[in-house]
Each structure stands twice: as C-alpha cells, then as structure tokens.
C-alpha cells in the first residue's frame, strides 16, 4: 500500500525523466489527473491519458507523455519535481508568504479552497493554501 500517492507519482516522473522514457504510467486518481492537467497547461508534459482498463480491474491507469526540448529532443522540459507538503508535515502558506520557485522560472502547485492551481493563479485570486510540489 502506498502511503503518499502524490509522492509516488512525482518519483515515477523523476525516474522516467532520468531514464529518458517517453511516457510513464501511474495509478489514477482525481488529484493526479488535476496535477497532470496543470503540468500540461504549463508546458511541462505533452499530454496525459486516463486508461480505464487495468489488470487489477478496480483502478485505472494515468499515462503521462513526457516532453523533451532541444534540437534532438534530449533535454527534458521538467528539470525536477520536488514534493513539499507531506502527510507527516503539511506546508501551508498565505498569499504573502508564497515562494517564487527558481526566481520565477518554475511553478509551485498548491491546493486551495478553490481547487488545485499554480502559484501565479493563486496570487491573482489572492488565495493561500497547501503547497503540493515545486516544478522547474
């Protein structure tokens, strides 16, 4: 049993990038789909697909197509994804305390009472929340 499914997803993406894989599959959930949608919208992944068929029969699979840049598509669009708020130590910030990831070159993904969004969207709406991860 996985105690932190978001950390598992982040670890799988980081490992797939290091291994230069084209895609990675993770067990699906609503929050993982929302995280994938934000990564796609921000240009860090090419696409994602939810596959309902699974050998176990009860949970679908989320297939994330990773994005590579450069002349020969060798440089990954994601340098690193870092988990911030963990089940044992939650990290909450107000809108004034919200960090700039890599001096504005990365994004922070956080969950607010209005849903999951990036740090720039939360600043525009003047919302704080729990920081899920940093992406750069």
From Swiss-Prot:
<keyword id="KW-0689">Ribosomal protein</keyword>
<dbReference type="InterPro" id="IPR000630">
    <property type="entry name" value="Ribosomal_uS8"/>
</dbReference>
<dbReference type="GO" id="GO:0019843">
    <property type="term" value="F:rRNA binding"/>
</dbReference>
<dbReference type="InterPro" id="IPR035987">
    <property type="entry name" value="Ribosomal_uS8_sf"/>
</dbReference>
<keyword id="KW-0699">rRNA-binding</keyword>
<dbReference type="GO" id="GO:1990904">
    <property type="term" value="C:ribonucleoprotein complex"/>
</dbReference>
<keyword id="KW-0694">RNA-binding</keyword>
<keyword id="KW-0687">Ribonucleoprotein</keyword>
<comment type="function">
    <text>One of the primary rRNA binding proteins, it binds directly to 16S rRNA central domain where it helps coordinate assembly of the platform of the 30S subunit.</text>
</comment>
<dbReference type="GO" id="GO:0006412">
    <property type="term" value="P:translation"/>
</dbReference>
<dbReference type="GO" id="GO:0005840">
    <property type="term" value="C:ribosome"/>
</dbReference>
<dbReference type="InterPro" id="IPR047863">
    <property type="entry name" value="Ribosomal_uS8_CS"/>
</dbReference>
<dbReference type="GO" id="GO:0003735">
    <property type="term" value="F:structural constituent of ribosome"/>
</dbReference>
<comment type="similarity">
    <text>Belongs to the universal ribosomal protein uS8 family.</text>
</comment>
<protein>
    <recommendedName>
        <fullName>Small ribosomal subunit protein uS8</fullName>
    </recommendedName>
</protein>
<comment type="subunit">
    <text>Part of the 30S ribosomal subunit. Contacts proteins S5 and S12.</text>
</comment>
<dbReference type="Pfam" id="PF00410">
    <property type="entry name" value="Ribosomal_S8"/>
</dbReference>
């Amino acid at each position: 049993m996985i105690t932190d499914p978001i950390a598992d997803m982040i670890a799988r993406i980081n490992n797939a990038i290091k291994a230069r894989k084209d895609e990675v599959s993770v067990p699906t959930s609503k929050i993982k789909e929302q995280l994938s949608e934000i990564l796609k919208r921000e240009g860090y992944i090419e696409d994602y697909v939810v596959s309902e068929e699974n050998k176990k029969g009860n949970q679908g699979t989320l297939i994330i197509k990773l994005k590579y840049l450069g002349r020969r598509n060798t440089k990954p669009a994601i340098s690193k994804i870092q988990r911030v708020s963990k089940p044992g130590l939650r990290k909450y910030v107000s809108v004034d305390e919200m960090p700039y990831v890599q001096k504005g070159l990365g994004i922070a993904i956080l969950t607010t009472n209005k849903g999951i969004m990036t740090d720039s969207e939360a600043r525009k709406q003047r919302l704080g929340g729990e920081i899920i991860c940093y992406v750069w």
